[in-house]
Structures are given as structure tokens and as C-alpha cells.
């Protein structure tokens, strides 16, 4: 059960890995090699041999089981499988609520993007718009510092180029993946241009009422989301929502498969489409960013007729979503 999971971030990471011959030796906090069940548990974690500065949790139920630095100097984590499973289920479970509240959030974003002065809300609204339209991760300071990889809130001025209304982002994201993508929007371009007029390397900055320079971070984004939705959504929910909507519509366009071979091929093709848009591997996309109802309903020949009925309707049930979004939302809601 999830109640068994413990939440010690660093205090329980007391086992270190030392090189020994062609293998490794794990040493506890008393300087003695681990053995027995603890040694067996560590082996099952399959910690990459290329990691260095590896620390392992002494608690088999800790949500973080191991940390280490990869070959590029990026901090990596191995989490308890029960924690991963529950965290993912919770994220998928809130997709219906996310869809219901998305129109209200969009109205707030639209209004704040029209602010005449460079306020915190105007910048956060700009970031939220970019989250939805580019699928760029929100980023966090710790990850940027440890791994030299970036997201929207940790972006630097050197990562951005503006020509007229077009903004191009070029940066290294999570797992060392290089991203280059652009958007064309006058208000987005203007806000970023004004941010870049403020001295400093951080991109999303502003001056508060006391003329103090402030840097917008991921906590500002999550606070904004809660203010305008009333729920604890995070920037990651945009990627799950976007990946699920794209997968559902793409499978609908494939039509019902007539053979098992076609079924597998269609699903594989669509997962690849989502993978390209999100910048993740196919395995990660299918596991974490496509709601399981999408794949399951396609396999059961439910998805295509559902989308066909939904697209033929004149109304979206009083919810201001696009036709693709409403079809996806209602499929998940009714599952």
C-alpha cells in the first residue's frame, strides 16, 4: 500500500557505492559492507554502472531509493516503484478535473497577458501559455544548477531569439535533449522582449512595487494554477493533457484496426507522434503522458465511434474546450 512509503529525502541516503575490481561494494554508515536482504534489494535497483557519487537509501520503503551523478554530471534519481505507480495514477485521475477547469484558466491567462505593465501575473500567464502551446517543461532551479539543463522558468536570455512576433527557444532540456522550437504571438514576444530589457541572465524577471528585482520560478506557476483553478495542478499536467489529447485524436484519424498487426502498428505510430511533440522517449510517453483509457478504448474499438459522435455534436456540453479536447475529456470521464 502507498501508506507504506516513507518520505525521507536525504537523511536515509546513507549507503554509498565504492568501486571494487570490476564491480561495486556498498558501504553502510558504519563503514561496513551491506549484505543479505539489503544487498539483494540494492541489486534489484539496477543502478547504472556509469553513475558516480551514488547514495542508496537504507530504508527499503523510502520514496527515493538511490541518487547519483551520470556521465554528464547530471543528478539522477531512482524512486520506489509503489511511489511511482501511485504518483502516476493520481496524475491521470485528475485529468477530468483539469479539463473542466482549463477554460477558466485560459481566460485568466488571456486577461493577464494584456496587462500594460510587466507584472508577475503577466509573466506567469505568459509561461502558462507557453506550457500549453510548446510542451516545454516548467523547469526548476535545483535541476538547472545540478544538470545545466533548462525549462521555462530557468531559461536564460541566451536561450531566446526574437524576430518580430516570433520567439525561438534553443536550449538543453531534461536528460540532455536539445530543443529548438518557436512560437509566433505578438503579446508573448512583447512580454519576453520587456523581460530581456531587465539586466541579468535570467529570462523571466520583473520589478516589484518596491523596485526590487524578482525572478519567476516554478512555485509562482503552481501558485497561479491553484489560484485560477482551485486545485493543486502542476505544470506537468499540461504535458499529460496535451499528450492524451494528441494521442486520442491521432488514433481516431487512424480508424479502427482490422487486424492485430494493424492495431499494434497504429498504437506504435501514435505513441511516436506524441513522443516527437513532447520530446520524450516512446516508452516514457506511453507510460506517463498518455492516459491509459486512450489506448485501452482504442484496443476495444470504443475510441473511434466515441470521437465520431463527439465531433458531430454542435455542443461541447457547456465546457469551452476544442472538439479534440472535449472528445478526449468525455472519453476519460465516462471510462
Regions found by a protein language model. Give the residues of each.
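A positively charged, amphipathic N-terminal helix/segment that binds anionic biomolecules
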Residues: 1-150, 154-267, 271-278, 285-287, ...
Amino acid at each position: 500500500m502507498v501508506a507504506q512509503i516513507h518520505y525521507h529525502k536525504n537523511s536515509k541516503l546513507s549507503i554509498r557505492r565504492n568501486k571494487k575490481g570490476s564491480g561495486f561494494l556498498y558501504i553502510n554508515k558504519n563503514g561496513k559492507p551491506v549484505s543479505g536482504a539489503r544487498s539483494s534489494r540494492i541489486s534489484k535497483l539496477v543502478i547504472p554502472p556509469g553513475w558516480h557519487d551514488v547514495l542508496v537509501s537504507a530504508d527499503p520503503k523510502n520514496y527515493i531509493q538511490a541518487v547519483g551523478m551520470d556521465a554528464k554530471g547530471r543528478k539522477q534519481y531512482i524512486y520506489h516503484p509503489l511511489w511511482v505507480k501511485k504518483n502516476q495514477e493520481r496524475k491521470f485521475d485528475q485529468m477530468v478535473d483539469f479539463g473542466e477547469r482549463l477554460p477558466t484558466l485560459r481566460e485568466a491567462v488571456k486577461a493577464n497577458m494584456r496587462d500594460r505593465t510587466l507584472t508577475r501575473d503577466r509573466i506567469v500567464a505568459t509561461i502558462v501559455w507557453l506550457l500549453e502551446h510548446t510542451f516545454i517543461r516548467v523547469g526548476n532551479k535545483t535541476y538547472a544548477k545540478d544538470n545545466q539543463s533548462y525549462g521555462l522558468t530557468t531559461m536564460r536570455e541566451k536561450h531566446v531569439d526574437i524576430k518580430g512576433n516570433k520567439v525561438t527557444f534553443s536550449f538543453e532540456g531534461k536528460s540532455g535533449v536539445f530543443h529548438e522550437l518557436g512560437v509566433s504571438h505578438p503579446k508573448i514576444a512583447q512580454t519576453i522582449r520587456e523581460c530581456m530589457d531587465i539586466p541579468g541572465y535570467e529570462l523571466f524577471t520583473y520589478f516589484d512595487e518596491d523596485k526590487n528585482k524578482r525572478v519567476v520560478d516554478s512555485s509562482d506557476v503552481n501558485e497561479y494554477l491553484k489560484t485560477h483553478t482551485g486545485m493543486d495542478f502542476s505544470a506537468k499536467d499540461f504535458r499529460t493533457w496535451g499528450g492524451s489529447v494528441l494521442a486520442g485524436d491521432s488514433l481516431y484519424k487512424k480508424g479502427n484496426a482490422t487486424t492485430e498487426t494493424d492495431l499494434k502498428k497504429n498504437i506504435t505510430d501514435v505513441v511516436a507522434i506524441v513522443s516527437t511533440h513532447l520530446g520524450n522517449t516512446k516508452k516514457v510517453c506511453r507510460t506517463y503522458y498518455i492516459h491509459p483509457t486512450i489506448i485501452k478504448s482504442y484496443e476495444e474499438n470504443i475510441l473511434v465511434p466515441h470521437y465520431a459522435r463527439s465531433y458531430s455534436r454542435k455542443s461541447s456540453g457547456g465546457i469551452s474546450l476544442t472538439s479534440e479536447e472535449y472528445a478526449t475529456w468525455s472519453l476519460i470521464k465516462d471510462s
